[in-house]
Every structure is written in structure tokens, then in C-alpha cells.
Amino acid sequence: VESQIKYGWECNYYALGDLVDIINQVTEEEIDAKMKEYTDKYTMKTDRIDSVREQAKYEVGLEKFLSANGIGAFADTFQDLHGLKQLPGIAAQNLMGKGIGFGPEGDYKISALSAVLMKMSEGKEGATGFIEDYTYDLTPGQELELASHMLEVPPAFAATKPEIDVLPLG
């Protein structure tokens, strides 16, 4: 409530089923158009094109949902995938590239902050974005820093053409 009072931010909950209804209305033509964007933007390093097409469907539907509701930032969570086969990782990547804030695991504060940072850095490619990173090996001399297990890494962070590689979890 305080962030709404101080900054005018609203933190609304929408049932995932409402988004799924929109995603299920996405046409094959819309998916094909999004896939064309993907093949222009990414190197396809997978034979699992059905999984990538599912991501394209999610991106089209999510963008429609956000636009229709005037939403400038969003979060998702592993615990709430009702009606979805996967998390919308590529959608999150590309929507961040369009200035939409993102936060993982339902973290509305990070999604709002990332939206503000993206607004501040408009016109400066790769200036900001979100990556859920961590350091998980603290063995002296073998420290591993800036590892990420999430799919939402913005393509703007890449030094070369980013790749789509679909790998099984586990």
C-alpha cells in the first residue's frame, strides 16, 4: 500500500487463468510471426521447436494481456503455472527489451524497480535489465560468479548473438 501512496504504483493480482485464456486464443499466424522474430534475433540451437513455439505463443498472449490492462511490470513464479506448460522465459526476456519490468518468484518490488530502471535508460541498448544471478561455488580459487539458472536473461546483455537452446530440467 505504501508504494501506491508514495509512487502511485499498483500491485494487482490477476488469476493466471485469465492470462491462459488469452494465450489459448493466440493464432498460428501470430506464433509464426513471433518465430520469425526469434530466428532473426537468436541462433536456434535446438531441435525442440515445439517448446520454442510455446514460448512464442506465451509472448504474444502476455504482451496482449499486459497492454490490455495497462501493466508496466510483472512477475511469475514456479508455484503458479496453472494452464501453462512452461514459464514464459523468452517472453520475459523480450518484454524487458521493450521496457516492461520483470521480477521472478512473484517479486513485485524487483519488477517495479526494473521498470523504473528501464525507463531511465531508454535509448541506451543493454544499459539495464534483470538477471537472477547467484554465486554458488565459494571454493578458494574456483569461485563461480554471476551464474544464472533462470531463462529471463535479457538478450541485450549478450556480447554476441544470443542462442535459444532447449534443455530438459533435472
Can you describe what each PLM-predicted range is?
Residues 1-68:
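Internal metal/ion-chelating core segments
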Residues 2-7, 46, 54-170:
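Anaerobic metallocofactor- and corrinoid-dependent redox/one-carbon enzyme cores
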